[in-house]
Amino acid sequence: MNRYKIGLISLGCDKNRIDSELLLGKLNEKNDIVNDPNKADIIIVNTCGFIESSKQESIDTILEMAKYKEENCKMIIATGCLTQRYSKELLELIPEIDIMLGVNDYANIQNYIDDFFNEHNKICQCKYSDISINEGKRILTTAKHMAYIRISEGCNNLCTYCIIPKIRGKYRSRSIESIINEAKELANMGVKELILVGQDTAIYGSDLYKENRLSQLLRELSNIEDIEWIRILYTYPEEITDELIEEIKNNDKVCKYLDIPIQHISNTVLKRMNRKSSKELITDNIKKMRKEIDGLCLRTSIIVGFPGETEDEFNELKEFVEEIKFDNLGVFKYSQEEDTAAARMKDQVSEDLKEERLATIMSIQQNVSSKINKNKLEKVYKVLVEGQNDKYYIGRNYQMVPEIDGAIFFKCDKILNVGEFVYVKITDTLEYDLIGVVCDESGQ
């Protein structure tokens, strides 16, 4: 049996990254993984199909990789959300694709590769399934000291703007035992930080155990000796319970960090979005969380330009962002996705107005972030070392998710290792980043 050199490009979210790592895990034993597409016999593109810009990026990337078939590359494989959604269209649009897989067809990828080289017939396996959850050995594509871990797949929320339930299926939790076993394997590989992801992590276990079990999962994960940080992403605010707040408050290994994607704050917009929350519920929960959890860092994401968004609704959102002062905030223009209820709504907002509103929110948040960072001067944080440049080491504290929340640049006289924890005293601030110097826990 031939041993092939395989390159992979992963696009989209961290959940897609996990799928890419599982793909590499399934292929690593009988093939060699390479980073340079010039050296690859097989190139895999794991696509994203969430919004228009991500769809275009996926198509452009496949076309770019297809050029390597003029040189050493013998096969192009496309997989992921875009192929799950548009398999027939992609086969016609990009004939260079040899194998196309959806989001549930990774287990047999080696067999598909062997079959193609034996029979030279294109393969398309994009059958929809909302039963299985991809699990198995992973080849990490993150830094070796941190890893994302998927605790659930799919979504039941049916937000009017979102296509994910049609791509990923109904919400289904992994078992606690399965997650703990994977976390132990990751810890044995040197992982210090676990980042829990799912479409809605707050309702973890509600399908499998008939009750939310995120708090229990956090307790059991914190018993793994070599794991030092546990971080939760994608917790819908209406599902955050008092029990979860208490667990975050009292568990030293759980980062005092919550990512609560509110999407909007106007009740009329939330209703059109088919969101289950309200302005009053969101506001009350934020106040409760900040009161109970000392030093809590809050991130959110919002959508501007949703169909029918009036000036009054947008002004309500602006005022809320100014008042609540999220530590971190991502803002996105509404993307009109076919096969969604929102795409059929009247009063679609123009692209120019979406751009204007996005810029307005970002300007407000830049001012908020700058003021929040200035309040961190002279404070001491536990920092995870991520790397270094010519002048500084680079790291993150509990308030920072990799690649999206900024970083801490700091000096140290001794040599530090990536994945090591140190204490850093903040000496200067930037808009989103911090500057500091290594110290002891007391700040000396």
UniProtKB/Swiss-Prot annotation:
Under Gene Ontology molecular function, one entry of this record is:
protein methylthiotransferase activity
Q: Where is the signal peptide?
A: none
- Quick check: keyword Ubl conjugation in the entry? no
User: What EC identifiers does the entry list?
Assistant: 2.8.4.4
List the GO terms this entry assigns under cellular component, sorted alphabetically.
cytosol
Reaction(s) catalyzed by this protein?
L-aspartate(89)-[ribosomal protein uS12]-hydrogen + (sulfur carrier)-SH + AH2 + 2 S-adenosyl-L-methionine = 3-methylsulfanyl-L-aspartate(89)-[ribosomal protein uS12]-hydrogen + (sulfur carrier)-H + 5'-deoxyadenosine + L-methionine + A + S-adenosyl-L-homocysteine + 2 H(+)
Note accompanying the cofactor annotation: Binds 2 [4Fe-4S] clusters. One cluster is coordinated with 3 cysteines and an exchangeable S-adenosyl-L-methionine.
**Domain MTTase N-terminal per the UniProt entry, residue ranges:** 4-118
Q: What does the protein in this record do?
A: Catalyzes the methylthiolation of an aspartic acid residue of ribosomal protein uS12.
Name this protein carries in UniProt: Ribosomal protein uS12 methylthiotransferase RimO
Q: Which species does this protein come from?
A: Clostridium novyi (strain NT)
